[in-house]
């Protein structure tokens, strides 16, 4: 069911293309920013194997998404390889989001044998001191590097994720250098979102909107260098930055102020993946130029649009609840009571998010709203309203009015 926004902009077919599944809350680390508020042991409310396999059946019947198995720490589940292999055999592209510390040579082989296409490993600093302070356990940095090397030795596609906060923001260039030296296929950065444990450290650790904007411009510059796939994840503003920078480049080159064409914001490349709650994955097609996923930041068809929560992305909790994304704690449905297809097609939360005409404040009147949408999770964290304006955007829209909204489509609950 396609929705239409208040400006007459169709939000595409809204197929579920990226599904992030928190298969357990159990984890061996104590990350101070943890979205999941993970526990030392697997939760008794983690879905049992039979029900988990049934959810995979529902997903495969409803769509053909990339399925990211995350946590907590997904390797805490004794049946994780059974789930990965089952999903792979159902035709789903499976990725694994792990902290890397449990990836021995044997585990790395089991990951590959289960059909996992890419593994993401989080590095929240360029050295052990910085990373381990964020992850809460001494030795986590060295163990993560060991796990990464074990995966690379088998030819596995590996992605590094970095959560940006005050304690490590200055190390971003060093983390990029480290990712390149380790042979990582991708580096994804995330701005800290105040959810879960992140609420307690937000005031101390979140960078300012101005610093955030500076980082996105730095990221654009680095994306032109090639050699590694780069994505600013949970950073919808990046699409505006790219548009503005490309326009400035055209003007500087004497091309004139011709408007840079917008990519179709509803398009999601079939092998590209963005964020989960806390761990992002991207699968890059073979033969695509290195650096920016589609060769140049102006060619964003593989990058899709900004915030994808509820439009092409959703998140499944360890108990089976469905959310727009892992950072937006607003329940759209419950797989213990409803089928996935029904939730995806009929959730009122999802339909509200698919209609950019519902956006409020400066997001509602911004010329980039269909491209960016603002981070709905940060809006919710700041105001309790996931349709309010993005609090970490420095851009001032050219207009100051809001666009009219259209009625909710029939059949939406």
Would you name each region that the model predicts?
Residues 1, 42, 47, 113-114, ...:
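Radical SAM enzyme [4Fe-4S]-AdoMet core and its adjacent flexible, acidic
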Residues 1-118:
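Conserved alpha-helical substructure of the radical SAM core
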Residues 36, 153, 375-377:
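Regular, well-ordered alpha-helical segments
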Residues 49, 53, 77, 104-105, ...:
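Structural motif corresponding to alpha-helix initiation and N-cap regions
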Residues 54, 58-71, 354, 390-413:
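Short Fe-S-cluster ligation motifs
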Residues 235-399:
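Accessory C-terminal segments flanking Radical SAM cores
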